[in-house]
């Protein structure tokens, strides 16, 4: 990824974290998807089967969804759902998109629906709960912290970019 695209991703993440766009940030990273069972090359990250599904939208069973966890620079564990396209081929590279909702929203709501729809169109997508929201860690709940939320986006991009 070149510097201009990286800067644009950071700017979009900042705007979205502040609630200005409330949609998604395009990562434009090709995801090497050789073996997802190995999770990611990132330290303190994991991928597991999605159990106890609480999504509030109609679930497309053709899209494989994994439960993921990764740590941001502030030490918060960020919880997410990794959506894999229909007929996912681990020998191919895929474009990736990371998505979160506006303040207080969780991955089981609109960001998960967007992630599912993008996965239907061939993207690897990651919908995540911002720190201090949903299943992500942080003892101060429902608190806005643009710097931490921006770091959540950086950590999400790092996680997806480092998939094996």
Where are the predicted features?
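Hydrophobic helical h-region of N-terminal Sec-dependent signal peptides
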Residues: 11-16
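Bacterial Sec-dependent N-terminal signal peptides
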Residues: 1-10, 28
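The serine-hydrolase catalytic nucleophile loop
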Residues: 104-116, 130
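Short beta-strand element of the alpha/beta-hydrolase
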Residues: 91-102
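N-terminal cap/lid segment of alpha/beta-hydrolase-fold proteins
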Residues: 44-92
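Sec-dependent signal peptide cleavage junction
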Residues: 19-34
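Conserved alpha/beta-hydrolase
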Residues: 117-137
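Alpha/beta-hydrolase active-site loop
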Residues: 143-164
């Amino acid at each position: 990824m070149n510097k201009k695209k990286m800067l644009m991703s950071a700017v979009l993440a900042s705007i979205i974290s502040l609630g200005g766009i409330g949609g998604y940030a395009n990562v434009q990273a090709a995801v090497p998807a050789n073996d997802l069972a190995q999770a990611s090359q990132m330290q303190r990250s994991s991928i597991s089967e999605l159990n106890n599904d609480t999504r509030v939208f109609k679930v497309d069973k053709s899209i494989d969804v994994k439960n993921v966890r990764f740590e941001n620079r502030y030490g918060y564990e960020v919880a997410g759902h990794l959506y894999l396209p229909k007929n996912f081929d681990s020998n191919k590279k895929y474009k990736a998109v990371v998505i979160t909702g506006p303040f207080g929203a969780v991955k089981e709501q609109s960001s998960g629906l967007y992630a599912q729809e993008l996965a239907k169109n061939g993207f690897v997508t990651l919908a995540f709960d911002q720190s201090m929201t949903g299943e992500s860690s942080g003892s101060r709940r429902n608190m806005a912290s643009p710097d931490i939320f921006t770091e959540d986006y950086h950590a999400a991009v790092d996680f997806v970019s480092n998939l094996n």
